[in-house]
Amino acid sequence: MANAQQMANAIRALAMDAVQQANSGHPGAPMGMADMAVALWGQHLSHNPVNPHWANRDRFVLSNGHGSMLIYALLHLTGYDLPLQELKNFRQLHSKTAGHPEVGITPGVETTTGPLGQGITNAVGMALAEKLLANEFNRDGHAVVDHHTYAFLGDGCVMEGISHEACALAGAWKLNKLIALYDDNGISIDGQIAPWFVDDVSQRFNAYQWNVIGPIDGHNPDKVAQAIAQAKLETQRPTLIICKTHIGKGSPNRANTAKAHGEPLGADEIALTRAALGWEHGPFEIPAEVYADWDAKAAGSAREAEWSERFAAYQAAHPELAAEFVRRMAGDLPKHFAQVAVDTVVAAHTKQETVASRKASQLALEAFTAALPELLGGSADLTGSNLTNTKSTPNLRFDAQGAVVKTEEGVGGRHINYGVREFGMAAIMNGVALHGGFIPYGGTFLTFSDYSRNAIRMAALMKQRVIHVFTHDSIGLGEDGPTHQSIEHAASLRLIPGLDVWRPADTTETAVAWSVALSNRDKPTALLLSRQNLAYAPKKDLGDISRGAYILSEPKDVGLKKKAQAVIIATGSEVQLALSAQKLLAEKKIAVRVVSMPSTTTFDREDVKYKKLVLPAGLPRIAVEMGVTDGWWKYGCAAVVGIDCYGESAPAGVLFKHFGFTAENVADTVRAALQRKR
């Protein structure tokens, strides 16, 4: 490099200036990792600032996202569309430089990081996606998918349990193109970490079957660059490069202390730091020669142009594969998807099978996985319960050399055994989705969505198409008892902005839920599915199911020639209960409409006219769902048949009676609501 020290100091200066101007932020990590960044971004990272979305770019993840001024400085200096004014607006409303990096806001940011440990886990997902796409699309002489995934991570990331889940899988999957650089500075918010972090990180990652390099001097760019070059030669293992660094490097009084972590250095300390670094330039001033040393636009454009030539040759030799690759990376569904979705829904409606909705999900998946090669499934050690596997998705396996094991038909596996790692699974799926080329889905019990929750939230924040298959959704799972019976989980998931939640009642609603989830380019989806069998609910019109709620049965459908006096709203397994209660009430000449509401989150986005059509004003509304009642009062319910306590261990049928989920109790609740109205 022309002047590696000045290049690193430019990062340090921008970091401390931006944090000082914002009066908020984390200067220490960017100052400590600046030399590591010079080595990676200056000598190894293959990227194009002119086109941040180049398909074959290396992916870079700043897992310790609080050090966001590192990546903002790098993006600005290397030539991305991130003007200096944006750095001056660090942490300000509507700027491109949020407190933590956000994908879709800042060009060049690959994932939203901040919750520690999830960035390295996203990176595992990205590296997995690269490996699987290379296996699927590369041909002899045509390596169109051939890039690395790099991650910077700190002490907090390796403390978080999710890093164990993800990095163990990375070793098992032999993700040799994943290279992580560990900013080992020994400091966290509470101070020196030695009293509470005694892991031998090197031995830990060796146990994960990683290639471990170091510890090395993280402030020697040449040493770091050499380590990266060595890591790129690895053919079977991911690599961890342990870089010993000093947080707040250059600050005479704050370096190596927690005071460098999460607050401005202060004007006096910044002046002292400038002097110590020999940085004679004012706030936000970068010399032209330093900009020139960092500028990656020409080199990046040349790399992409060279790849484009290779891709053109690939297109000529394999036109169908090339077209499929372009479609997949664009996130477009195939043209025949709409017809497959219609056929799948109609088939379910025609067969009218009585099956658990988890089985209904598998039936829908059989059609969708056959039609969509981008579907990449999995389960957290519950495949036989979640039913996430299909004939088109054999289990993913790797041979001793790290190659994807292919079936007799010559295809690689598309169903991942994540092991008992719900949080890791969820964040890996986020990384797969962020990389592009796949639509990931994964299964576990609904109760264990709590393990995954923050990664689900991150998927919603990042607007990623990730599908969660949550089975055993209620007390209907029976004898396993309250530890496994979901009570608050449906309501809790519905509270996450940007997450679509579906709790379908039968095979048709489940097929619709899957088709909507697959069509949602900018939303994750949670499917809440039953363990127990559910009878088919007869329907006349299928068109309104996708709107989240629809009129399932009117009084005339049970022999009454009068208008509805009340509305029963039900979801999932309770829809049959509502229909049974409707019949009981009809025997007493009480007319009731039954509304199936498989997705409250979808229905809530509908226009007022449709909402009033489904839930007319003036009629008492009674909601029925085996879970907490809080979320139902927003619909103006007169009563809710729900569960505001934990479950019990007993057969499902016994529990239904114990908690009042009988047709008789629902009918009595409706009668009581009508009596109160009088």
Q: Where do the language-model regions lie?
A:
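Conserved acidic/glycine
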Residues: 1-33, 152-153, 157, 161, ...
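Thiamine diphosphate
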Residues: 1-149, 297-528, 533-535, 613, ...
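Short glycine-rich or small-residue beta-strand-to-loop segments that form or flank ligand, phosphate
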Residues: 60-62, 110-112, 150-154, 213-214, ...
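Glycine-rich anion-binding loop/nest that anchors nucleotide
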Residues: 154, 444-445, 570, 596
